[in-house]
Swiss-Prot record:
Protein name in the entry: Acetylcholine receptor-like protein cup-4
Cross-referenced InterPro entries: Neur_chan_lig-bd, Neur_chan_lig-bd_sf, Neur_channel, Neurotransmitter_ion_chnl_CS
GO biological process per UniProt: chemical synaptic transmission; determination of adult lifespan; endocytosis; monoatomic ion transmembrane transport; positive regulation of egg-laying behavior; regulation of endocytosis; regulation of membrane potential; response to caloric restriction
Membrane topology summary: Multi-pass membrane protein
Database matches in Pfam families: Neur_chan_LBD (PF02931)
CDD domains recorded: LGIC_ECD_cation (cd18989)
Residues bearing glycans: N41, N68, N237, N249, N403
Signal peptide: 1-24
Family indicated by similarity: Belongs to the ligand-gated ion channel (TC 1.A.9) family. Acetylcholine receptor (TC 1.A.9.1) subfamily.
Annotated compartments: Cytoplasmic vesicle membrane
Length: 435
């Protein structure tokens, strides 16, 4: 009985001691008395604060992040374009998106073991050294400070013992002047570029395209991510290129010697190729033109000359209405007259000539002026007309017929046939050769 009492006392005291040891081990993140999330965040925040104090102690944002001044800082650049806006009247293009820049900093280094294994630090853009970049063809001017956002987060990653990788991803909205040529309207195809350069020479800063990857395009979300049609234009391709400016010349060959590096600037370009997207051109311009052409043709086969003259006037009125629509749509800058406008002008002039022709005939038919002998030779055509087509009482001696009414009855169908052949040739040239 005494032995059982001793074992009971020992067992009770042992459980109390064991529970105390377990509670002592669970203090911290797994403690039942504290909030694990709050404890973890407070610790991470504290480590981040200590890390920023450490890496920015004595850091100079105006000094290039290399310990050897003779070594240039290489900045990798990648473009992410989310929208393109083209203004054909102002001859400008506006590019919106994000620009990714990456370089290595030899001063923003730390040992992750001293800061709870932290390998990343997120800081403000103004806290670190960054390359000074400008857009050479910016519509706001060469020294514009509004092309790139002034606020952007920077990620610092400790990748090596003696240097850290710095990544910056600011947004941009760049408006540049372009040289558009719409001489092939509505089949015109143009190209415009955004030229980026660093204000420091290549002896200090060198820009280059990240792994030669072309710009990323995201003009929409989900189903619209492959969208390429914006307003009146279709984006054909967006590419990136690199070239060098030095001694007043532009070259694609990189400099080699130290003297050349000290007098050359690296430049990057985003090239946007686009073509006009005009799906309604045929229905709004070509189709009405064909209708006017039919009016011209019908006028030559109208029963009376006066009716033909009225048809011509109506066609001229319609063409002037369509001409106003074309004038509104066509761009202002043209190196040559577009083939579509040339064709429309030909049809308009042909209609005016047809109206004058029928107007003169209408006036002559109401007079007793005889038909001049030279143009009476047109009656010879009737000799080739089948007998079944000839009307009763048709004059046999055409040389003696001086009646303008009879002459117009023969001349108008011939003129209409000649006009038809002329129109067919013009349309074929427009479709095949595009005058």
């Amino acid at each position: 009985m005494r032995l059982l009492l001793i074992f009971t006392v020992i067992f009770v005291f042992y459980l109390a001691i064991l529970k105390r040891d377990v509670n002592a081990q669970q203090q911290g993140i797994d403690s039942e008395e504290g909030d694990a999330e709050t404890f973890f965040n407070r610790t991470y925040s504290a480590h981040q604060s200590d890390l920023e104090k450490r890496i920015f102690r004595g850091y100079d944002i105006k000094k290039r992040p290399v310990k050897n001044a003779s070594v240039p800082t290489v900045v990798d650049v990648h473009w992410h374009v989310i929208h393109v806006s083209i203004n054909q009247k102002e001859q400008t293009m506006t590019l919106h998106g994000h620009i990714y820049m990456r370089w290595y900093d030899e001063y923003l280094v730390w040992d992750p073991k001293d800061f709870a294994g932290i390998h990343y630090a997120r800081v403000k853009k103004w806290q670190v050294w960054q390359p000074k970049i400008r857009v050479s063809n910016s519509a706001s001017g060469l020294a514009s400070a509004f092309d790139f956002s002034t606020s952007a987060h920077v990620i610092i990653q400790m990748v090596e013992k003696d240097r850290a990788k710095v990544e910056m991803y600011p947004t941009f909205s760049i408006k540049v002047g372009c040289m558009f040529d719409f001489g092939d309207f509505p089949y015109d195809q143009n190209k415009c570029s955004v030229n980026l350069f660093a204000t420091d020479t290549m002896a200090e800063v060198q820009l280059q395209n990240l792994y030669n990857i072309p710009p990323t395009l995201s003009f929409g979300w989900e189903e619209q991510k492959m969208k390429r049609i914006i307003s009146d234009f279709k984006i054909l391709n967006v590419s990136a290129s690199q070239f060098y400016y030095g001694s007043g010349n532009v070259s694609k060959t990189a400099p080699v010697t130290g003297f050349e590096l000290g007098n050359t600037w690296s430049m990057l370009a985003v090239n946007v190729d686009f073509v006009r997207h005009s799906p309604y051109f045929w229905s709004t311009i070509v189709a009405p033109t064909l209708v006017c052409t039919m009016f011209i043709q019908v006028s030559f086969f109208a029963p009376t000359v006066s009716l033909a003259f009225v048809i011509n006037l109506m066609a001229i009125y319609l063409e002037f209405m369509f001409l106003q629509d074309i004038t509104i749509k066509i761009p202002l800058y043209l190196s040559k007259r577009p083939s579509s406008i040339t064709l429309f002008h030909i049809l308009l002039i042909s209609n005016i000539v047809s109206a004058v022709f029928h107007g003169v005939l209408c006036a002559l038919c109401s007079t007793k002026v005889p038909v001049p002998l030279p143009i009476r030779k047109i009656y010879a055509v009737k000799d080739y007309v089948p007998a079944s087509w000839k009307e009763e009482g048709m004059v046999v001696d055409y040389a003696c017929d001086t009646n303008w009414t009879e002459w117009t009855r023969t001349a108008r169908p011939l003129a209409g046939l000649a006009m038809f052949v002329y129109f067919v040739i013009m349309f074929i040239l427009y479709l095949v050769v595009r005058i």
